[in-house]
Each structure stands twice: as C-alpha cells, then as structure tokens.
C-alpha cells in the first residue's frame, strides 16, 4: 500500500471512530459505484449523513477541508442520491459533512468536523 493510501485509510478509520463516539451508526465505508466513491455513510439519529474525509500530514499546503471543492460536494450529493436508491434506509433528511484530519508527526490526530456543508 502506498504511503498516501495508508494515510487516507488511517484518516477514514479515525473519522469512523470519531462519529461512532458521538453515537452515530456507520452504515457504509468506501462505497463505490461507477460514478465515484463515498468515504463514509452513517446515521446521526434519523438523519443520513454522507461524509467526505480528507487527511493530511500537515497544513503546509492548506487545511484538509480546503481541498473539498464545490464541484466535489456536488458529486457527493449525486452519489448520496445513488446510494439511497440502492439501500433500503429511511431518513428524515440527508446531510453532507466534511471531516478534516491532520496527522502531526507526534501526538494525536487533529479532527475538525464540519457539519452540513451543503
């Protein structure tokens, strides 16, 4: 596994633990279809939440959240609709969150959870 892939995978593990610690139920991780991939899908109460996870080793080139563009968010919304057509899940609404993770050389991961970004 490439170092970049390992960092991303670790970040997704941190994000899943983060939302589970807040009482979410994780429904899917790394769900793929021909249109793209969703990093994390979960239920926050009765709200279906689709999460884009961005992980970086530093903020030298900007924060991880800054890497999530409006174009990417539009794609995530389309993928969320596709996910819902393929899964029998009832939700009062759908929300898109971004979890931005910085992995410093020493110490714990820094997690920023941005809720309802679109």
Give the role of each language-model region:
Residues 1-29:
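Acidic-basic catalytic patches of nuclease active cores, encompassing PD-(D/E)XK
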Residues 30, 39-41, 54-56, 99-102, ...:
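Anionic group-transfer/hydrolysis microenvironments
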Residues 86-118:
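Domain-level recognition of nuclease-like catalytic cores that cleave nucleotide substrates
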Residues 19, 38-64, 68, 76:
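Conserved catalytic cores of phosphodiester-cleaving nucleases, focusing on short active-site segments
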Residues 34-36:
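Short acidic/glycine-enriched loop/turn segments that link adjacent beta-strands
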Residues 25, 48, 93:
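Hydrophobic "anchor" residues on beta-strands that sit immediately upstream
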Residues 60-92:
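Mid-chain, well-packed structural core segment of small domains
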């Amino acid at each position: 596994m490439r170092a970049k892939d390992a960092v991303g995978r670790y970040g997704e593990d941190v994000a899943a633990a983060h939302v589970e610690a807040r009482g979410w139920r994780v429904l899917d991780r790394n769900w793929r279809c021909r249109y793209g991939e969703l990093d994390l899908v979960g239920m926050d109460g009765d709200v279906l939440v689709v999460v884009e996870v961005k992980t970086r080793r530093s903020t030298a080139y900007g924060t991880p959240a800054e890497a999530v563009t409006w174009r990417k968010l539009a794609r995530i919304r389309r993928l969320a609709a596709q996910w819902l057509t393929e899964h029998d899940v009832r939700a009062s609404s759908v929300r898109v969150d971004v979890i931005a993770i910085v992995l410093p050389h020493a110490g714990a991961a820094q997690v920023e959870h941005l809720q309802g970004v679109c």
